[in-house]
């Protein structure tokens, strides 16, 4: 009977671990139009460099109008 209790406890702990990791929330990403990028955004690498100088974590070219949008985790 002691062996059965260990199996049940192990299964319970494994299920708890699966549900706990599933419920963890990812950080939301906020984005804003770059204030310093000039012209058409044709290179997300250039956009990202400008955004990092503005204090963001990254940036990319988005949309039909090819604008540079900066991104960072929301506070």
From Swiss-Prot:
<feature type="disulfide bond">
    <location>
        <begin position="41"/>
        <end position="61"/>
    </location>
</feature>
<feature type="disulfide bond">
    <location>
        <begin position="51"/>
        <end position="70"/>
    </location>
</feature>
<dbReference type="GO" id="GO:0005576">
    <property type="term" value="C:extracellular region"/>
</dbReference>
<feature type="signal peptide">
    <location>
        <begin position="1"/>
        <end position="27"/>
    </location>
</feature>
<feature type="disulfide bond">
    <location>
        <begin position="47"/>
        <end position="68"/>
    </location>
</feature>
<keyword id="KW-0732">Signal</keyword>
<comment type="subunit">
    <text>Monomer.</text>
</comment>
<dbReference type="InterPro" id="IPR003614">
    <property type="entry name" value="Scorpion_toxin-like"/>
</dbReference>
<dbReference type="GO" id="GO:0031640">
    <property type="term" value="P:killing of cells of another organism"/>
</dbReference>
<keyword id="KW-1015">Disulfide bond</keyword>
<dbReference type="InterPro" id="IPR008176">
    <property type="entry name" value="Defensin_plant"/>
</dbReference>
<keyword id="KW-0964">Secreted</keyword>
<keyword id="KW-0611">Plant defense</keyword>
<keyword id="KW-0929">Antimicrobial</keyword>
<dbReference type="Pfam" id="PF00304">
    <property type="entry name" value="Gamma-thionin"/>
</dbReference>
<keyword id="KW-0295">Fungicide</keyword>
<protein>
    <recommendedName>
        <fullName>Defensin J1-1</fullName>
    </recommendedName>
</protein>
<dbReference type="InterPro" id="IPR036574">
    <property type="entry name" value="Scorpion_toxin-like_sf"/>
</dbReference>
<comment type="function">
    <text>Plant defense peptide with antifungal activity against F.oxysporum and B.cinerea.</text>
</comment>
<comment type="similarity">
    <text>Belongs to the DEFL family.</text>
</comment>
<dbReference type="GO" id="GO:0050832">
    <property type="term" value="P:defense response to fungus"/>
</dbReference>
<feature type="disulfide bond">
    <location>
        <begin position="30"/>
        <end position="74"/>
    </location>
</feature>
């Amino acid at each position: 009977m002691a062996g059965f209790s260990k199996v049940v406890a192990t299964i319970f702990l494994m299920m708890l671990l699966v549900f706990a990791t599933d419920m963890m929330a990812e950080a939301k990403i906020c984005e804003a139009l770059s204030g310093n990028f000039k012209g058409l955004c044709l290179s997300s690498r250039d956009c990202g460099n400008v955004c990092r100088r503005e204090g963001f974590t990254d940036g990319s070219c988005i949309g039909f109008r090819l604008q540079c949008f900066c991104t960072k985790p929301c506070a």
